[in-house]
């Protein structure tokens, strides 16, 4: 856990170090993704590590899929973390031995408090979702399109401009949630609560 804290501190300190001059890539390569969703103000297209410098669309789509998926998971993680900090808990027992949901602490401490059989069930359920339910539709409308005949929420009733705007909102909120859950985890390990009144 301390390694995670130090790694995040090092990464944030590196943001203020003088930047090295990287080799210039061709304008044509960078232009390949400048009009993609997510290349928004104020940064525009941002690829400091050059992950898609070769202009490979398949690689870009895979990275975008992973970014969207991690963003969605992070949004749920932030909401869950804040709900638990607010005192909202499931009723009943988490295990047959009488351990209640209310007895499970927040954050990393929950991993050691949940019975091993419960952790195995959680991992198995996530594996089931990964392999069977939450799969990117081959030939879907866009990368990260998980509609599988059951999940729609009226998406098909929106016009193209509205769909693009909503996808941009989801992408930005997912990026913010990834930073948010990381900040909550780092501060938890530092023993500093950043939530007001808690």
Curated annotation (Swiss-Prot):
GO terms for molecular function: chlorophyll binding. It is found in: Plastid, Chloroplast thylakoid membrane. GO terms for cellular component: chloroplast thylakoid membrane; light-harvesting complex; photosystem II. GO terms for biological process: photosynthesis, light harvesting. InterPro entries: Chloro_AB-bd_pln (IPR001344), Chloroa_b-bind (IPR022796). The gene is FCPB. PANTHER family: CHLOROPHYLL A/B BINDING PROTEIN (PTHR21649). Disulfide bonds: none annotated. Belongs to the fucoxanthin chlorophyll protein family. Residues 1-31 form a transit peptide. Pfam families: Chloroa_b-bind. This is Fucoxanthin-chlorophyll a-c binding protein B, chloroplastic. It comes from Phaeodactylum tricornutum. The LHC complex of chromophytic algae is composed of fucoxanthin, chlorophyll A and C bound non-covalently by fucoxanthin chlorophyll proteins (FCPs). The ratio of the pigments in LHC; fucoxanthin: chlorophyll C: chlorophyll A; (0.6-1): (0.1-0.3): (1). Keywords: Chlorophyll, Chloroplast, Chromophore, Light-harvesting polypeptide, Membrane, Photosynthesis, Photosystem II, Plastid, Thylakoid, Transit peptide, Transmembrane, Transmembrane helix.
């Amino acid at each position: 856990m301390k390694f995670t804290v130090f790694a995040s501190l090092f990464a944030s300190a590196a943001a203020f170090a003088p930047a090295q001059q990287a080799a210039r890539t061709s304008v044509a390569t960078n232009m390949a993704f400048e009009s993609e969703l997510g290349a928004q103000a104020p940064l525009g297209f941002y690829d400091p590590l050059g992950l898609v410098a070769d202009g490979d669309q398949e690689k870009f789509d895979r990275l975008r899929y992973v970014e969207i998926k991690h963003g969605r998971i992070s949004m749920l993680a932030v909401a869950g973390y804040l709900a638990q900090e607010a005192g909202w808990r499931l009723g009943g027992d988490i295990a047959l031995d009488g351990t209640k949901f209310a007895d499970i602490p927040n954050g990393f401490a929950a991993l050691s408090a949940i019975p091993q059989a419960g952790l195995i069930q959680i991992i198995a359920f996530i594996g089931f979702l990964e392999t069977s339910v939450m799969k990117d539709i081959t030939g879907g409308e866009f990368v990260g399109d998980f509609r599988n005949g059951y999940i729609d929420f009226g998406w098909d009733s929106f016009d193209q401009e509205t769909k693009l705007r909503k996808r941009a909102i989801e992408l930005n909120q997912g990026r913010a949630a990834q930073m948010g859950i990381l900040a909550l985890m780092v501060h938890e390990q530092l023993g500093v609560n950043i939530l007001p009144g808690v």
